[in-house]
UniProtKB/Swiss-Prot annotation:
Signal peptide: none
Keywords: Electron transport, Membrane, Mitochondrion, NAD, Respiratory chain, Translocase, Transmembrane, Transmembrane helix, Transport, Ubiquinone
One Gene Ontology term of the molecular function aspect: NADH dehydrogenase (ubiquinone) activity
Function of the protein: Core subunit of the mitochondrial membrane respiratory chain NADH dehydrogenase (Complex I) that is believed to belong to the minimal assembly required for catalysis. Complex I functions in the transfer of electrons from NADH to the respiratory chain. The immediate electron acceptor for the enzyme is believed to be ubiquinone.
Record-level GO cellular component terms: mitochondrial membrane; NADH dehydrogenase complex
Protein name, UniProt field: NADH-ubiquinone oxidoreductase chain 3
Broad enzyme group: translocase
Length: 131
C-alpha cells in the first residue's frame, strides 16, 4: 500500500503541473510584470536592494536548522536507541561541529561591509570572504 502511495503521488504531481502548464493562459504585459503600487505606475525604482548579509545569514541558518531538527528523534527516544543510536548521534554532531569550524575558517560568518553608492537609490555591500 505504501509503495503504491510512493508511486502514485509523484505521478499525480507531474500530471497536475503538466495540466497547469497546458491549460493556463499567459497574458503578460508591463503593468502585470511590474510592482503593484496602489494602481499607479511607479515613476522610480520601487524595489530597494536587499542586504547581502541578511541573505548570507539566512542561507547559513537553513542547513544548521535542518541538522539540529534531525537530532529530535534521538532526543525523543534515547532509551530505545541504545549504543548504536548514540554512536550515530555522536558522529552526526562531530560532522556538524567540523562543518561549523570550516565555515569559521573560511570566514563565511565574518561580514566586512564597505558601503558603495554607485547606483542611485540602492545600498550595496561588498562582502570580503578572503582577507
Amino acid at each position: 500500500m505504501f509503495t503504491a502511495y510512493l508511486i502514485l503521488c509523484p505521478i499525480i504531481a507531474v500530471v497536475l503541473v503538466g495540466l497547469n502548464w497546458l491549460l493556463a493562459t499567459s497574458n503578460s504585459y508591463i503593468e502585470k510584470d511590474g510592482p503593484f503600487e496602489c494602481g499607479f505606475t511607479s515613476f522610480q525604482q520601487s524595489r530597494s536592494a536587499f542586504s547581502v548579509a541578511f541573505i548570507l545569514v539566512a542561507i547559513l541558518f537553513l542547513p544548521f536548522d535542518l541538522e539540529i531538527s534531525s537530532i529530535l528523534p534521538f532526543v525523543i527516544s534515547p532509551y530505545s536507541n541504545g549504543l548504536y543510536g548514540l554512536v550515530i548521534l555522536v558522529i552526526f554532531l562531530i560532522l556538524l561541529i567540523v562543518a561549523f569550524v570550516v565555515e569559521i575558517q573560511l570566514k563565511a560568518l565574518q561580514l566586512n561591509r564597505t558601503y558603495t553608492n554607485d547606483l542611485p537609490h540602492t545600498e550595496l555591500y561588498d562582502i570580503n570572504i578572503n582577507d
